[in-house]
Design a protein with these regions (language model features):
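Conserved, well-structured interaction surfaces
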Residues: 1-41, 57-99, 266, 271, ...
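Short, flexible loop/turn elements at secondary-structure junctions
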Residues: 50-53, 89, 203-205, 281-284, ...
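Long, intrinsically disordered, low-complexity segments
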Residues: 73-75, 132, 139, 158, ...
């Protein structure tokens, strides 16, 4: 990029307008790269001119810049270039950097910097990197950064909605329709043409530029001889999705007396949950709308008893192995076709599979190679910008009416109860980010910038996280299902303070 920017100024084959546009695109790419570095490592060397190579490699050594200066560079670059980028790209350049993309990067980078400034005081990190500012930003800078986020987000939300961008919506209030609408937003069928994507990465199988998301993540029984089962969402995430009436999302396994609740189908326990849950995650008993149809079957085992209490016979292997038990002459499967064992095999160990981004139009997952998927990947979308501004406003304790409207735009599209002014809290905004942006590569970085990753999972952090499974059991006497929770047999996650700056 630095070489390009140096040489484009002297070329005579481009007009000034063309030079300005191409320079802005190159500077956007450079700012994106620096954002990827600073969010991982803190301050890095800022190199904005070509390096001169010689036989002495020490001439290439450059000291780190401060974390604050790198964030300031990214924000300043976006502020300088966004007006040189087109508001709407032509069809032959629609996936290149636009005005909205530069504004979205400005919004996100400023929000990250504001959080790092505000919350880094909880860390006990010491040493030269801290004292020199290579890591950590002064708390006094937090307000400035949150204000920058508010400014960038407001240009998009006030000046470009609905003329350029709008939330992808359905007029229906039906849960299934709302769930399908949310799934469609990220689907291959829509292919990014949803009015909400600000910047996306497109793929082209015919040009040998595909990806392998579907090969890696299709549910077990639909994978043919493919791989599948790559992501097993945890019960902790499922329960973050509220009920449509706005009540807490914890699932009802037992009644107020402590008695197990029986359900006709494993799917019934999720009734009236936030429709985004159904659009994001395949749940036990959920209809599968891709090739093959049917339902997701994840059963932990069978019970010979009453009211969820009795002798349990549990799955001990993955679904295509022997998981059967004979009781009083009748043979029962102790596993569903999509899993049930917590310890071994490829199938989900939690009872859930990821639906968001999976291509349900793919005709056959058998023998799909590593580059046969082409669902686009979203980098920036309007939903994030609403949540960025809402968070910045709450952090500033300013513009709270705008924050309330922003979060209710997201909740309204989802089809769940809107918040009142008294319900608008930082915790609510953060939860909304967790469910709205699930699987879009935000959560890990959000926890890092809030300086919560090193905390124990019981305190909202990553340390000691293993992920809880939801375990449906089929009662052979009643023909109904009861639920328990379980812990998959996998390693505990650890995150120490030094991991904030190790990538």
């Amino acid at each position: 990029v630095n070489n390009f920017l140096q040489h484009i100024t002297v070329t005579s084959v481009l007009s000034d307008d063309e030079k300005n546009l191409l320079s802005a695109e190159a500077r956007f790419i450079r700012a994106m790269q620096y954002f990827g570095l600073v969010k991982r490592y803190g301050g890095v060397p800022l190199q904005t001119v070509p390096m001169e190579y010689s036989s002495d490699p020490t001439s290439l050594y450059q000291a780190r810049d401060t974390e604050q200066s790198v964030y300031d560079f990214i924000i300043d670059e976006c502020k300088k270039i966004y007006m040189d980028l087109p508001e709407v790209r032509s069809s032959d350049s629609k996936y290149q950097a636009s005005r909205g993309a530069a504004l979205a990067l400005w919004s996100r980078a400023a929000l990250y910097a504001g959080s790092i400034a505000k919350y880094s005081g909880v860390l006990t990190l010491t040493g030269e990197a801290v004292s020199n500012g290579y890591v950590r930003i002064s708390e006094s800078e937090a307000e400035r950064y949150f204000t920058e986020c508010y400014t960038a987000s407001s240009i998009i939300l006030n000046d470009m909605v609905p003329q350029v961008y709008s939330l992808y919506k359905t007029s229906s209030s039906d849960t299934d329709a709302l769930a399908q609408n949310f799934y469609n937003l990220f689907s291959k069928a829509i292919n990014g043409e949803n009015g909400e994507y600000i910047f996306q990465k497109q793929y082209d199988v015919e040009a040998d530029k595909g990806h392998m998301w579907d090969k890696l993540n299709v549910p077990f029984s639909y994978r043919g001889d493919g791989w599948g089962c790559g992501v097993s969402p945890a019960l902790e995430l499922v329960e973050e999705f509220e009920y449509r009436d706005g009540s807490d999302g914890k699932l009802k396994l037992k009644d107020e007396t402590g008695k197990y609740i029986s359900y006709d189908s494993p799917y019934d326990i999720f009734e009236n949950k936030d429709p985004r849950l159904f659009g994001s995650i395949y749940l036990p008993g959920a209809p599968y709308k891709g090739t093959g149809g049917g339902n997701i079957e994840w059963i932990r085992g069978v019970i010979d008893g009453e009211d969820g209490i009795g002798t349990k016979y549990e799955a001990t292997a993955q679904p295509d192995k022997e998981n059967k038990v004979t009781i009083n002459g009748t043979v029962y499967n102790t596993s569903g076709k999509d899993g049930g064992c917590l310890a071994v095999g490829d199938a989900s160990k939690t009872g859930f599979y990821q639906r968001k981004f999976l291509d349900e139009t793919m005709e056959n997952y058998t023998n799909i190679d590593a580059k046969r998927s082409s669902t686009p990947w979203v980098v920036f979308r309007l939903g994030e910008i609403y949540l960025n501004r809402a968070e910045a406003c709450v952090e500033l304790n300013q513009h709270l009416n705008e924050a309330l409207n922003d979060i209710n735009e997201i909740r309204g599209r989802a089809g769940i109860k809107l918040l009142t002014a008294s319900e608008l809290t930082l915790e609510k905004v953060r939860r909304e980010r967790k469910v709205e942006l699930a699987f879009e590569r935000h959560r890990y970085w959000d926890l890092k910038r809030w300086r919560k990753s090193h905390l124990d999972v019981s305190q909202g952090g990553l340390t000691n996280f293993r992920g809880t499974a939801l375990c449906p059991y089929y009662n052979i006497k009643s023909g109904k299902y009861t639920f328990e929770t379980g812990i998959p047999a996998k390693r505990i996650r650890l995150f120490t303070e030094k991991n904030y700056y190790t990538g």
